[in-house]
Amino acid sequence: MSKEELLQELAGAVITCKKDAVLAAVEKAKGELDPSEIIEKGLAAGMNEVGVLFERGKLFLPHVMMAADAMTAGVEALKDLMPEGSASSKMGVIVNGTVEGDVHDIGKSIVSTMLQSAGFEVHDIGRDVPIKNFVEKAKEVNADMIGLSALMTTTLPGQRDVIELLKEEGLRENVKVMIGGAPATQAWADKIGADCYAENASEAVAKAKELLA
């Protein structure tokens, strides 16, 4: 099989939510492709497509959850090929979540999975997360970075509020902040004083490595 065919098979298995098919595709791809490529261009590509179909009303939440489970199983199957994952806390500790008032979960979950597979210790605290919970969790796990996702214009201010609370608590100097989500932009990141903006999951991994190196 060509590289493209392997990647298509990986993505297709995630889209159809077939865990067995995902594991079989991962097994097949292991000897041919780099683990990060299997995740980013195969599994995550499939999950991104699921997200698009969900947003368009073509798929429903149970399908999304099953696809996410299938993708997670695929990532787990690659753990033994990712030596840096065993020293994840050395790469950096990241708290990741979707801000209060926002129930979107897919993009944030993909980012968490990919950060984890890149070797970071990730604490995904879910969606619709109150501002103070981000800061409390960061203190609890001694986080190096907080990832803030917002998928609606109305919830964007929550990203700014987390940064303000970090300042009030005297933690801002020690905790980097990365923002993302459809309405977020580099200009918004600059305005609220975030350390970086990531347009997608691959960029989130690259920027986290850059900031926490």
UniProtKB/Swiss-Prot annotation:
GO biological processes: methanogenesis
Domain B12-binding: 91-213
Binding site for methylcob(III)alamin: 104
Keywords of this entry: Cobalt, Metal-binding, Methanogenesis, Repeat
Domain B12-binding N-terminal intervals: 1-90
SUPFAM superfamilies assigned: Cobalamin (vitamin B12)-binding domain, Methionine synthase domain
Metal-binding among keywords: yes
Pathway: One-carbon metabolism; methanogenesis from dimethylamine
Cystine connections: none
Molecular-function annotations in GO: cobalamin binding; cobalt ion binding; methyltransferase activity
Function: Acts as a methyl group carrier between MtbB and MtbA.
Similarity remark: Belongs to the methylamine corrinoid protein family.
Name under which the protein is recorded: Dimethylamine corrinoid protein 1
